[in-house]
Amino acid sequence: MSSLTNPNIFTVSRLNSEVRLLLENQLGIVWLVGEISNFSAPVSGHWYFTLKDSMAQVKCAMFRGNNRLVSFKPTNGNQVLVKARLSLYEPRGDYQLIIESMQPEGDGRLQQQFDALKMKLASEGLFAQSSKQAIPEHPKCVGIITSKTGAALYDILDVLKRRDPSLPVVIYPTLVQGEEAAIQIAQAIGRANSRNECDVLIVGRGGGSLEDLWCFNNEIVARTIAASQIPIISAVGHEIDVTIADFVADLRAPTPSAAAELVSRDNSHKDQALMSREQKLRAAWRHYLTEQNRTIVSLSHRLEKQHPRYRLMRQTQQADELQIRLQRAMEKYLAQREQKVSRVQHKLQLLSPVRQISEQKNALARVEQKMMDAMDRKLLRLRHQIAIAAEKLDTVSPLATLKRGYSITQSESGDVITRQSQIKTGDTLVTRLSDGEIRSTVN
């Protein structure tokens, strides 16, 4: 059966197309923190790079229409926070991210610190439910640890005044933002425990950015909350704001006003029922809005994918890929030609007459040196043989006999006198000794 008529059999191109649509339509927008590597900016103006961390990496493309809005020029090694869509480069089947915006890592770094501290404290059991203290059902005195000029304090006081005007309140003022805020918050909690005049504490502030709320993600504050003998309700920011203090506290309230409601008596059960219904309605409405927004985003993405501009981007990316491959092929070809030329040059050097003459000169010099060495050894042997022969001649030499005390007598003409009959009266005789001669006359 043909693959074109069987709906259960895919071609490769169809499979890649289906996977791309699945990635783009189902997952939508993602935020990602990572380090840039393999950064490339072809003449088309698009950017191609890899985002990585210590464990994994993913290929990314940022088209010219988006990257021209980036306020800095990325380089390898940059830590960045990106907003991206998941996609698939169909010709190669490569999963990739299409980057829509990029900025240097800031909040991403704080989030990593947040996650690291959260994991550390959780491993020590500071978040365990078994270590939580029960919040008094009807507190006799409420302590408030927050800024004395912040809106959070007035929100708490307004709720307490409306719900339980007779409830005593003690305020422990402190900074709730800045470098010194964490130390002051911890000191205020310690001061409340030392004075021991309240049976529940509310620690919090109004909403703000991640940096504004960062003092409530401080390890000192977290450990001070965990060590408090008085139950603590955290009430930091809005409902969507979550801090380390929320995990360590005995109870988390979504807002300072909600914390005030938790510690105050409600004089009207009807108000409670109404509030419960209101909360359910708000939750249902938020859920409905979220689903509708998700549907709108999905439909807008589908419409965007059908736009000719998107097809042009994919074709441009493919052209960039072909350009890169062509450049690599040319570089490889040139490198091979250079190697071949180098080998030919080496062979020519080996066959060069100048080189051969130089080698023959060196060989002749070595032979000449060997001949000189052989002549020196031959002369040495001859000198040794002559010395031995001289010793032998010296042994039989007349002079050697004279040295042993003998003498030789000769006539004046030089004949050796060996018999008495060779001389007569009046002859002059020469007697040779080892150190000279004696002349005498025969009487």
Curated annotation (Swiss-Prot):
The record's catalysed reaction(s) read: Exonucleolytic cleavage in either 5'- to 3'- or 3'- to 5'-direction to yield nucleoside 5'-phosphates
What are the UniProt keywords, alphabetically? Cytoplasm, Exonuclease, Hydrolase, Nuclease
GO biological process terms, semicolon-separated? DNA catabolic process
Spell out the subcellular localization from the entry. Answer: Cytoplasm
Which Cys pairs are S-S linked?
none
Kindly provide the name given to this protein in its UniProt entry.
Answer: Exodeoxyribonuclease 7 large subunit
Could you tell me what this protein does?
Bidirectionally degrades single-stranded DNA into large acid-insoluble oligonucleotides, which are then degraded further into small acid-soluble oligonucleotides.
Q: Which family does it belong to?
A: Belongs to the XseA family.
What species was this sequence derived from?
Vibrio vulnificus (strain CMCP6)
CDD domains found in the cross-reference section: ExoVII_LU_OBF
Output the InterPro entries linked to this UniProt entry: Exonuc_VII_L (IPR003753), Exonuc_VII_lsu_C (IPR020579), OB-fold_nuc-bd_dom (IPR025824)
Q: Which PANTHER family match?
A: EXODEOXYRIBONUCLEASE 7 LARGE SUBUNIT
Keyword field contains GTP-binding: no
